A protein has these predicted regions:
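Mid-to-C-terminal alpha-helical segments outside catalytic/metal-binding sites
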Residues: 1-3, 28-46, 218-220, 234-273
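Short, electropositive alpha-helical surface patch
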Residues: 57-73, 157, 209-217, 238-249
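Alpha-helical elements of Rossmann-like donor-binding domains used by nucleotide-donor carbohydrate transfer enzymes
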Residues: 34, 61-64, 119, 142, ...
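A cross-domain feature marking catalytic cores of carbohydrate-active enzymes
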Residues: 7, 50-51, 78-81, 102-104, ...
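Mid-domain alpha/beta scaffold segments of enzyme catalytic cores
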Residues: 1-127, 204, 243
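Catalytic pocket-lining loop regions of alpha/beta-barrel enzymes
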Residues: 113-223, 231
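Divalent metal-coordination and catalytic microenvironments
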Residues: 6, 62, 100, 124, ...
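Active-site environment of divalent metal-dependent phosphoester hydrolases
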Residues: 10-13, 54-57, 83-84, 107-108, ...
Length: 273
């Protein structure tokens, strides 16, 4: 069963208010039911819901979504800080959480301290969770030593590290990501190519990047829609998910690669059976 490894859900703002004092964009409702309809329309049978930055460590909306249709088909990724208790971690694991996300992108002002990152890794290790890293080429050189030292848990690099296609394989960040993917515990999410592209259609400039990342770690690549595209530059909220999947297919050489990225790899990482 195909898996979308990176949708977000937003509940009714009256019930689930923003917790981030400086959100880049106010939440607009995009319910779990809406996400399910999108998944059914494009053929996803599994999903990994990612906690929006707007909610910080308040996972109530995410927990409610998982409770509605967990049934072994959906997992979740949360946000971690020192205020998250051991009891919360146990409850979130039982609900379906399988990892935590750290945001290094400067404009969000949410980068973790090395101490928080290390303590979080130690705390989630008992559950077999992984960490997701949202980072871009501007932040990667300064973070590479910290990231390279992570060996105890799997690490998923979100959104192809937001690599810039205008620089192609010559940019420093491109080589740094490939170096990380040579480590057996590093994975990459082949997503957000449309936003990375300097083109308004076709998105040919990001195809070599996706192909290179897949070639570096074909058994550790995932895909995510990033629905509902909350920070899209387009008023319409981003391209149809069918276009995102079509772009993914251009990264992958054959049907076996598509099976791995959409079905086998996410099942192995998230414990789907």
């Amino acid at each position: 069963m195909s898996c979308d490894c990176h949708p977000h859900v937003f509940g009714d703002p009256g019930k689930f208010p923003d917790r981030n004092p400086n959100p880049l964009q106010a939440s607009r409702e995009a319910s779990f039911e809406d996400a399910l309809r999108m998944h059914e329309a494009v053929g996803f049978r599994r999903g990994v819901l990612v906690q929006p930055a707007n909610y910080t460590t308040d996972h109530c909306c995410l927990e409610e979504a998982l409770a509605r249709i967990h049934r072994g088909r959906y997992r979740a990724i949360g946000i971690m800080d020192d205020m998250v208790t051991d009891a919360e971690l146990a409850r979130l694991h039982a609900a379906g959480m399988r990892g935590v996300r750290f945001n290094f992108v400067r404009m969000f002002k949410m980068a973790p301290s090395p101490r928080l990152l290390q303590s979080s890794i130690e705390r989630i290790g008992q559950y077999g969770w992984y960490i997701k890293i949202f980072i871009g080429p501007e932040e990667l050189p300064n973070a590479i030593e910290t990231l390279g030292a992570i060996t105890a848990v799997p690490v998923v690099i979100d959104h192809m590290a937001r690599l810039k296609p205008v620089d192609g394989a010559r940019q420093e960040a491109h080589d740094l990501v490939l170096d990380l993917l040579r480590r057996e515990n590093f994975w990459v999410l082949l997503s957000n190519g449309v936003r990375m592209s300097a083109q308004t259609s076709g998105y040919h400039d990001v195809v070599p990047i996706g192909q290179a990342l897949h070639a570096a770690a074909p058994d550790r690549c995932l895909f995510g829609t990033d629905w509902p595209h909350t920070h899209s530059h387009n008023e319409g909220g981003g391209p149809p998910e069918s276009k995102l999947i079509a772009l993914l297919y251009r990264f992958l050489p054959d049907a076996a690669a598509r099976q791995a990225v959409l079905v086998d790899n996410p099942a192995r990482l998230h414990g789907f059976v």
